[in-house]
Amino acid sequence: MKKKALLPLFLGIMIFLAGCDYSTPEKQDGFFFNTFVQPMKHLLQWLGNDVFHNNFGLAIIVLVLFIRLILLPFMLSNYKNSHMMREKMKVAKPEVDGIQEKVKRARTQEEKMAANQELMEVYKKYDMNPMKSMLGCLPILIQMPIIMGLYFVLKDKLVNGLSEHPHFLWFNLTKPDIWITVIAGVLYFIQAVVSSKTMPQEQRQMGYMMMVISPIMIIWISLQASSALGLYWSVSALFLVIQTHFANIYYSKLAKKEVQPFIEKYEREHNPSSKKKGKNTQVVSKKNKK
């Protein structure tokens, strides 16, 4: 799934959030309520009432960390694929650009198919799989129903005890708060900036668009809902900023190390002088041994 497909998805979610209502017992039924809203209600009640003794702010923070740990393997795989793809594309780019020019100049369907087949061979040679980029959307898709379930739990005040113990830090968890909303928006903007650093040049325009759309969407929804959702997003964004920063450092070094054999292979194939140089060094080393 390309990131462009996330825009209509976000619009559909906003329409869905605006249309659903679980505020009365007779409305609390159906697949979505029973699968996502009800479990989130029981989990938040257990954390807030039993584990943290009526501290629902801590309950939401722990809930965020729990969800982030579940998503961590998918996120790490995404970071690794992104860095590997970027480093390998640097090596393969001259060949890829040449084939893409062939595709543009192709006049028949057969010529286009032949050029595309040639492109697939280049991807195979450098062990590149563009389909892996689809996994980048997986954490978002997994998290969406969880966030939507939490949204309805908080919006319709379904958690027992939250109305009696709504305060955390300076804000009321059951009401909108402008400051926690702004914090959530700013942190998601920073997260988008940090993430965009690893994007290939051709994808950065979409990344810049998401930098604007994500914070605006989060601010808009947070202002319509209780500040508990703003707290959820703030903690989640802070976790993502830290996670992305350290993952970029680690996987950037790892990708450069693993791509080095492909660079050496490319130089041998496209720079004959490097082959001669390599042979000469081998001859010199043999003479020195003698």
Curated annotation (Swiss-Prot):
- Offer one Pfam family short name for this entry: 60KD_IMP
The residues forming the signal peptide are 1-19
Q: Which GO terms describe its cellular component?
A: plasma membrane
Query: What InterPro entries has UniProt attached to this entry?
Result: YidC/ALB3/OXA1/COX18, YidC/Oxa/ALB_C, YidC/YidC1/YidC2_Firmicutes, YidC_ALB_C
Lipid addition sites, S-diacylglycerol cysteine = C20
- Keywords, comma-separated and alphabetical: Cell membrane, Chaperone, Lipoprotein, Membrane, Palmitate, Protein transport, Signal, Transmembrane, Transmembrane helix, Transport
Q: Name one GO molecular function term.
A: membrane insertase activity
Q: What does this protein do?
A: Required for the insertion and/or proper folding and/or complex formation of integral membrane proteins into the membrane. Involved in integration of membrane proteins that insert both dependently and independently of the Sec translocase complex, as well as at least some lipoproteins.
Protein name stated in the entry = Membrane protein insertase YidC 2
Organism of origin: Staphylococcus epidermidis (strain ATCC 35984 / DSM 28319 / BCRC 17069 / CCUG 31568 / BM 3577 / RP62A)
User: What gene does the UniProt entry assign to this protein?
Assistant: yidC2
